[in-house]
């Protein structure tokens, strides 16, 4: 589908271009560029993607790969542009909040995620991200009252997120927050393997 020339530039295989949409081709191109490195991703962002207005999945994919590459500021720029065209797209806003959190703008990320939770109170991804920002705010806090508040909220949102799909990620974090609060009784609803993972870490 995508081929590399000897100069490491990306080019599309013309045999399949008529079978899938332009946005799907770009998503495949982004995924291929991610394997090459940051320079290839930047070339896409500054070249074939930025001047055009594609489907939100293109911005989601590109923003996500920049985050995975450890470039939250560039990821933020990508996702912020995507949000201008799709202001209600949930995934773009979730990734935008993650980019903010990873960039150190924890409060801004927290406020955005609070808005998303109001819209969809039972979305595990949003609840888990909101919990993560409260965990970060707990770490950053200097006042005891603020530390207690954010630790309690982190535990609360991780518990809520876990109850939706019972995923490993939210389960381990919920168990960790329970122990940090000194409330081992909160571990009872969680599988023993999550508590064991926390005790051993």
What kind of region is each of these model predictions?
Residues 13-32, 51-64, 86-98, 102, ...:
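Amphipathic alpha-helical repeat scaffolds of TPR domains
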Residues 140-148, 160, 164-166, 175-201:
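Amphipathic, oligomerization/interface secondary-structure segments
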Residues 29-43, 64-77, 100-112, 144-155, ...:
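Helix-turn-helix repeat elements of alpha-solenoid scaffolds
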């Amino acid at each position: 589908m995508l081929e590399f020339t000897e100069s490491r530039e990306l080019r599309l295989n013309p045999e399949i271009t008529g079978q899938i949409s332009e946005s799907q081709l770009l998503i495949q191109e982004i995924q291929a560029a991610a394997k090459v490195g940051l320079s290839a991703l930047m070339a896409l962002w500054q070249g074939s993607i930025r001047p055009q207005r594609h489907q939100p999945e293109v911005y989601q994919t590109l923003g996500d790969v920049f985050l995975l590459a450890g470039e939250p500021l560039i990821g933020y720029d990508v996702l912020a542009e995507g949000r201008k065209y799709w202001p209600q797209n949930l995934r773009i806003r979730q990734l935008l909040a993650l980019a903010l959190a990873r960039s150190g703008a924890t409060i801004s990320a927290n406020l955005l995620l609070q808005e998303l939770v109001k819209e969809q109170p039972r979305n595990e991804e949003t609840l888990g991200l909101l919990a993560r920002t409260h965990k970060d705010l707990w770490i950053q806090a200097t006042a005891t009252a603020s530390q207690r508040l954010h630790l309690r909220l982190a535990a609360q949102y991780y518990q809520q997120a876990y109850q939706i799909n019972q995923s490993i990620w939210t389960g381990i974090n919920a168990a960790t927050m329970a122990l940090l609060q000194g409330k081992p009784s909160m571990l009872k609803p969680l599988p023993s393997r999550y508590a064991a993972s926390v005790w051993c870490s």
